[in-house]
């Protein structure tokens, strides 16, 4: 009898052999946290045991959402010190704030608890240090499925497994670009979208894109072609004409770079290359366009809704999906207005 053994089946067997649920904690009960709660509550063999958030209203909404779906005890707190007394297999950090992410990481990695970051801001800031701390304590730290870095990484893995060379890789810019956007200017739009104005600002002003591509580059040991990246207008059909070497009519002085493009949101892309004549014939026959540069694409990423994949991966495969292995790229701040000495910069 043939057995179908996908990740769901493997995880079910893992739980049956373990005879104990995987215990998960969550820090950050905002928009992303609510999606995590909805998904974790539907996972076989996974139990959410604590939710931490400084916002009491969000904390209450999150707790009520989970308790409606699962009838187990749940610790709720507005302080990360509550984690000290909780037994966990995995902690999911979903605040989107580097300072909070760093404090949470210190708390759990020192105890050998695995850490999933739906907080790529922390990864882009101290990712290499987090990886070293995790390895020292026998834990795993990884960026979550659902964010563009891991979605793009799936394309990279697919391409390299087929012996293609990845020339460039990146994401689509989702929101209209306004480098001068602020939380106050986006307050109304954020309210309509049920988002934190600071988070929406990071999408609109380009911060999120820079942070995400930094995380991807530092894992793959890639770089950027120019400061700030090119960020061109492109489509899935023609991006392989631009993000290729200049000698072949493209924009790039370098290969193995990360970048982004307007016009392909909310997906990710990889421009790949083969020097083999027959491979290129096959790719053209398979209606992949004209080579020798080809585009692989995934036209979506499902943010917090993909968290079950990361949980299962950590418990079954026991290695990080994406965590800095080099430090080639960093993100720096760029002023949106003239700033007088002594001005409180706020956060974005």
Where are the language model's segments positioned?
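N-terminal Rossmann-like dinucleotide-binding module
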Residues: 3-65
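Conserved N-terminal Rossmann-fold NAD(P) cofactor-binding segment
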Residues: 55-86
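Beta-loop-alpha module in the N-terminal Rossmann-like domain of NAD(P)-dependent dehydrogenases
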Residues: 77-81, 86-108, 121-124
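Rossmann-like NAD(P)H-binding beta-loop-alpha module
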Residues: 134-135, 142-208
């Amino acid at each position: 009898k043939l057995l179908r053994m996908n990740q769901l089946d493997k995880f079910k067997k893992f739980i049956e052999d373990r005879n104990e649920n995987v215990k998960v904690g969550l820090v950050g009960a905002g928009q992303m946290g609510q999606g995590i709660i909805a998904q974790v509550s539907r996972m076989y063999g996974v139990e959410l045991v604590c939710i931490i958030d400084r916002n009491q209203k969000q904390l209450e909404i999150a707790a009520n959402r989970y308790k409606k779906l699962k009838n187990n005890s749940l610790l709720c707190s507005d302080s990360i010190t509550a984690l000290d007394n909780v037994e966990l297999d995995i902690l999911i950090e979903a605040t989107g704030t580097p300072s909070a992410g760093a404090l949470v990481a210190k708390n759990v990695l020192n105890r050998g608890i695995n850490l999933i970051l739906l907080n790529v801001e922390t990864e882009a800031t101290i990712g290499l240090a987090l990886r070293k701390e995790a390895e020292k304590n026998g834990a795993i730290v990884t960026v979550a499925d659902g964010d563009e870095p891991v979605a793009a990484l799936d394309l990279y893995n697919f391409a390299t497994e087929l012996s293609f060379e990845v020339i460039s890789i990146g994401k689509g810019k989702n929101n209209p670009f306004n480098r001068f956007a602020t939380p106050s200017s986006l307050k109304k739009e954020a309210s309509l979208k049920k988002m934190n104005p600071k988070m929406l600002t990071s999408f609109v002003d380009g911060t999120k894109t820079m942070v995400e591509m930094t995380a991807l580059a530092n894992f793959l040991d890639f770089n950027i072609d120019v400061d700030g990246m090119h960020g061109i207008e492109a489509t899935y059909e023609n991006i392989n004409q631009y993000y290729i070497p200049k000698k072949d009519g493209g924009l790039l002085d370098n290969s193995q770079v990360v970048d982004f493009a307007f016009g392909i949101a909310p997906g990710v892309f990889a421009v790949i290359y083969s020097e083999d004549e027959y491979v290129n014939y096959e790719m053209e026959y398979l209606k992949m366009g004209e080579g020798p540069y080809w585009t692989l694409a995934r036209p979506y990423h499902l943010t917090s809704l993909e968290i079950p994949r990361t949980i299962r991966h950590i418990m079954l495969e026991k290695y990080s999906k994406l965590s800095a292995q080099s430090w080639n790229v960093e993100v720096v701040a760029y002023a949106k207005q003239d700033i007088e000495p002594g001005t409180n910069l706020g956060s974005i």
